[in-house]
């Protein structure tokens, strides 16, 4: 299967630059892959798609303000660091710009010395391992000095950084938001729960690889980035009980899908408490073991996320739905509209 098989025409003006005033005011395209139907709706009508006895599974990761702007104390040269993942203690893997100025031992100062990064190791493609020194609590220092790492296709400044977090964000660690969850309000979640749907949370810390284009033609040669995930025993038990009683596992977003399918693949379709790193690549031909339906945003042409949706609903039907979304002027990507796939 070829990367170009997942290409489609997307006018640049359909890439949403800012979030809508109300989270759940976005449009929702409901696609039923068995009956090959699609219905234009609004996101708050997702309530109609959920049935009593279902479980709605959400990723409660929280985006760190992971973009830091600082300078080298000796030369005052400007340096940008993007935090990717905490390797141990105060050591982080980062993406540095310009990386060539940062050799092992080089220091970078942020916020007039409130935070100092010392390079301990050089990696490829501009990556570095740095060790931070600071007074107080690291996350509090980061909250005051860092900026939200918005995706490369968003050029507008974000006025309210909370709009790039889900309302249920809890576990610090992501370099990008699990954007399918941005549409939910607390009020909508209450209505869903009142309907008899179980709300279940897992964690997958979204890495920057989520924006990395596929650089090979043959999909079998593509290697996915690794991301940390965690599912508690309580969540696993709830989901297994829902399955056993005939309810559906409805995932919110591709990160929830990848976590559930990673664990389901390890334990023959059953869910157990588990944590680790996953680089699962879900593409057409993959047999889903856990997820019965899901919501997701509209993704980039030729991306692994379009491939994942195609694995569930069929490539031709998914591309037909995407072309419909373009014709109907749906908004795309992180701050865009959503689809519900069943």
Swiss-Prot record:
GO molecular function: S-adenosylmethionine:tRNA ribosyltransferase-isomerase activity
Protein name: S-adenosylmethionine:tRNA ribosyltransferase-isomerase
Function field: Transfers and isomerizes the ribose moiety from AdoMet to the 7-aminomethyl group of 7-deazaguanine (preQ1-tRNA) to give epoxyqueuosine (oQ-tRNA).
Assembly notes: Monomer.
Catalytic activity: 7-aminomethyl-7-carbaguanosine(34) in tRNA + S-adenosyl-L-methionine = epoxyqueuosine(34) in tRNA + adenine + L-methionine + 2 H(+)
GO-annotated cellular components: cytoplasm
Top-level taxon in the UniProt lineage: Bacteria
GO terms (BP aspect): queuosine biosynthetic process; tRNA wobble guanine modification
Localisation per UniProt entry: Cytoplasm
Enzyme class label: transferase
